[in-house]
UniProtKB/Swiss-Prot annotation:
One of its GO terms (biological process) is FtsZ-dependent cytokinesis. This is Cell division protein FtsA. Self-interacts. Interacts with FtsZ. CDD domains: ASKHA_NBD_FtsA. Residues 416-455 have a biased composition (Basic and acidic residues). Belongs to the FtsA/MreB family. It is found in: Cell membrane. Keywords: Cell cycle, Cell division, Cell membrane, Membrane. Cell division protein that is involved in the assembly of the Z ring. May serve as a membrane anchor for the Z ring. It is a peripheral membrane protein. The keyword Phosphoprotein does not apply.
Length: 464
């Protein structure tokens, strides 16, 4: 069985994370990770290019060693900053009976990219909401259907400021890897929700170091997404000021004794901290600490509620899903549940090695990559049962179950080309299976050329 790897990079404000994974039945098997803490990122953006580049390079190396994979190509997640979310439609026509395949789907989606009229932005994700075959046949996946006249798509679109996109890609590719594609967290978050949550209307709250990102899904699709410049760093600042100690000490205390729900915090758990303006050590209880934490986390949630109100939402029937590094704090779920009547849960990836909320974005980037590979029908994987990995698998939505792998597809096509140059086969009569395989190879080669040229075209357009 050939190996098909996906590599995702999550450039966060406090650390850079890399995950190497593979599609395994209905889930993802993580085979290697890397994480490097850095000061080169601020508010989700590159603040110091050299420091950020070194952190990215280090985490790629760690993931490569852990997985045994020579990482050459990656999928990059992008934050919800300078981002626009809107709906668009496009249609392509046929002049004879045509069996729809991945190339037709790619063509109708690419046409939406060309319609972007938001100044200084680049469309990074176009995700289909529904397809319509021959004007009146609405389907979720048109592949293998026969169209006589047309294929239309109604899609959601995510666009981001070009400067943000190009600087992130430039920094990653300066580490000696190629960015195959990028996925916004706004789209990625759909893969941490259950189908029921997405249908009823659910709000994802990702509390990171500098940013809290909010995405709302309803009727199975992304409605909108925003970011709030208030997050874990603000919690630590409040602790440092309230306890009259240094930021580093406040950060350690937060992780060791922090509790976001005052009513559940302990007044028996005692710790001491150094003071900034003296040599004195002052003792505090977890309840004292919780007083500062709860106020700030409440403020973050109130900001989230403001975002939802701006969207005209008064009810979140599918509930709230909290994730990100600051979701590790005890009491976060209890505090939010005390503030709302809807269901609240903390999302933590269940794969071995990444069972922390801060890995949600990186692993869901792989889910996004797999979903688009299936949609565009890039490559077919023959699965084999292997019970040894069952504990490391997280179930993904059945809607996004796939048999494709973008990363290895590029690797396979490259190897095939090299082999063809060395030992071309003599002409022979093709069987039906041969013709099918040949057609598939041509489609894959065409797709590869489009993918490889995407960001080169972007680079060129920035200077026109």
């Amino acid at each position: 069985m050939e190996e098909h790897y996906y590599v995702s990079i999550d450039i966060g404000s406090s650390s850079v994370k890399t995950i190497v994974g593979e599609k395994f039945h209905n889930g993802i098997n993580v085979i290697g990770t890397g994480q490097t803490y850095t000061s080169g990122i601020k508010n989700g953006l590159i603040d110091d290019f050299d420091i950020a580049r070194q952190a990215i390079k280090d985490t790629i190396k760690k993931a490569s060693i852990a997985s045994g994979v020579d990482i050459k190509d990656v999928f990059l997640k992008l934050p919800i900053i300078g981002t626009e979310v809107y709906d668009e439609s496009n249609e392509i026509e046929f002049y004879e009976d045509t069996e729809i395949d991945g190339t037709h789907i790619e063509s109708v989606l690419e046409g939406i990219r060309d319609k972007n009229d938001v100044p200084e932005t680049e469309v990074i994700n176009v995700f289909p909401i529904r397809f319509v075959v021959d004007k009146d046949n609405e389907v979720s996946d048109p592949k293998e259907l026969i169209a006589r006249h047309s294929l239309k798509v109604d899609a959601g679109v995510i666009a981001i400021q070009k400067s943000i996109l190009i600087n992130m890609i430039k920094c990653v590719e300066a580490c000696g890897v190629d960015v195959l594609d990028v996925y916004s967290d706004a789209y990625n978050y759909g893969f941490i929700l259950t189908p029921t949550e997405k249908e009823l209307g659910a709000c994802v709250i990702d509390i990171g170091e500098d940013l809290t990102q909010v995405a709302f899904y309803e009727r199975g699709e992304l409605v909108d997404a925003e970011s709030i410049e208030m997050a874990g760093r603000d919690i630590t600042d409040d602790i440092a000021q309230g306890l009259n100690t240094t930021y580093d000490t406040a950060e350690k205390v937060k992780h060791q004794y922090g509790h976001a729900f005052y009513d559940s915090a302990s007044d028996q758990d005692v710790f001491s901290v150094d003071q900034v303006d003296s040599d004195e050590h002052v003792q505090y209880t977890q309840k004292d600490l919780s007083d500062f934490i709860e106020q700030r986390v409440e403020d973050i949630f109130f900001e989230v509620f403001d975002v939802l109100q701006e969207l005209g939402l008064t009810k979140v029937n599918g509930g709230f899903v909290v994730t990100g590094g600051s979701a590790n704090l005890l009491g976060v779920k209890e505090l939010l549940q005390d503030m709302v009547s809807e269901k609240v849960r903390i999302h933590t990836p269940s794969q071995m090695g990444i069972r922390k909320p801060e890995f949600s974005s990186a692993i869901s980037t792989i889910s996004s990559s797999i979903a688009f590979d299936e949609l565009l029908d890039y490559v077919t994987i023959s699965y084999q049962d292997n019970e040894e990995f069952e504990e490391e698998v997280i179930e993904t939505d059945k809607d996004t179950e796939t048999k494709s792998s973008g990363f290895d597809w590029f690797k396979r096509k490259s190897n095939k080309k090299e082999n063809d140059e060395v030992a071309p086969e003599a002409p022979r009569e093709e069987s039906y299976e041969d013709r099918e395989n040949h057609l598939e190879d041509e489609q894959q080669t065409e797709g590869k050329a489009k993918e490889e040229s995407k960001f080169k075209k972007l680079m060129k357009s920035l200077f026109e």
